Amino acid sequence: MQNELAQTIPELINWTKEREFSLSLSSDRLAFLLAISIYNNEQTDGELLESDLIDLFRYVSEVFDQSEATLTQRANNAINDLVKQRFLNRFSSEFTEGLAIYRITPLGVGVADYYVRQREFSTLRLSIQLSIVADEIQRASSAAEEGGDERFWRNNVFAPLKYSVAEIFDSIDLSQRMMDENQHQIRERIAELLSQNWHEAILSCEQLLDETSGNLRELQDTLNAAGDKLQAQLLRIQSCLIGRDDLDFVDQLIVNLQNKLDRIISWGQQAIDLWIGYDRHVHKFIRTAIDMDKNRVFGQRLRQSIQDYFKCALVTLYCEAESLLDLRDDETMLNEAEAVGELPSELEYESLSDVQEQIISVMQAHLAPFRAEGKPIDLGAVLREQLALYPQSRHFDVARIIVDQAVKLGMASLDSQAVYPEWQAINDKGAEVQANVIDQYNK
């Protein structure tokens, strides 16, 4: 029996050769085709006049900053080019006195549909598509259980599965491939942001990572919820084919649909796993950049403090200018005088390394019981508790040390599930932290 599922490679090659396709679309030509497609969708009869096409080309020409003087000539060249490449069909008659009517071809519809509709991939659209698939497969399985001759199977089982279910599966698969491209674009945007000014780009990177992770998780949940039911219905139909050698074409179609469904579902999970790995890589890069760029962070905080200096409600009152000059003499006398007595502890010098070692030892002693007793570490609560014991000038170093010591002990199980925690305040100066509870400790 002739394979009714798809054409063979030689058939497709001969078909292409007979039609002599030669496709080449520059950016302005593609924009012109998309404009024609969108305008055509708004027309009731689907027919376009040459004046309509010239008006559409005028919009494209303005966007691409092309000369107005040669507009008509370039519009005619663009129209003839689309007709030659079979994106448009031209119809003319001796009764229309040279006026032509244009209709967009299936090839033009397909190319425009790829660039316009397939980018609208959302959970709502996916849910509607899966709902339609479920209804079609349900009707097909009910018809299969009724039984009948080959013609009955062809009309009531094979036709809806091939021309409805299979096409929707192909549409979902194509949309997933568009999301692959979208992920690559997001990665390029994140790389560009981090290469310019990573400190200012952290918030934008977090937003892009969160949005993409949430979209992938939501779409995968929708696929998982419907996948098992669809596979069960396909198995129902397949069980009705036992002993029916005349229905091999239906059995082959069922196998193809099962493979497509498995590929769609597995793609979603694989995309999530890959994105989680990329997410961790970006966060690791940011943490490393912070550790390597302490001087820059300090410099930025210093510049910020200078910029905010005049916002403080401080007023200096000057009076008796001569007395102020006299103070200089007193200062000179004090500088020349010999210092006696003990220096207050607040003014004693402590090296930064000694201070950090003290804080590290204290934090290790504080966090060790959590690991020993298997208790989860809530970084937000620990940071709030410890920062309250230190002056504000040490909050940055203390917070960094606490996070470093906690990460060495273990990790949060929610991180592997792409679950992002809420921001928590850790002091009364507006500092916040975003961290899941650490509940898996290293051995």
Swiss-Prot record:
Using the UniProt annotation, give all residue ranges assigned to the region (Leucine-zipper): 209-237
On whether Calcium is a keyword of this UniProt record, the answer is yes
One GO location term (cellular component): cytoplasm
Q: Which residues form a coiled coil?
A: none
Subcellular location(s) of the protein: Cytoplasm, Nucleoid
Keywords assigned: Calcium, Cell cycle, Cell division, Chromosome partition, Cytoplasm, DNA condensation
GO annotations under biological process? cell division; chromosome condensation; chromosome segregation; DNA replication
What terms describe the molecular function in GO for this protein?
A: calcium ion binding
Stored SUPFAM superfamilies: MukF C-terminal domain-like, Winged helix' DNA-binding domain
Q: How does it assemble?
A: Interacts, and probably forms a ternary complex, with MukE and MukB via its C-terminal region. The complex formation is stimulated by calcium or magnesium. It is required for an interaction between MukE and MukB.
Xref: HAMAP family: MukF
Similarity field: Belongs to the MukF family.
From the Swiss-Prot or TrEMBL record, give the protein name: Chromosome partition protein MukF
What's the source species for this entry? Answer: Actinobacillus pleuropneumoniae serotype 5b (strain L20)
Which gene name does the record give?
Answer: mukF
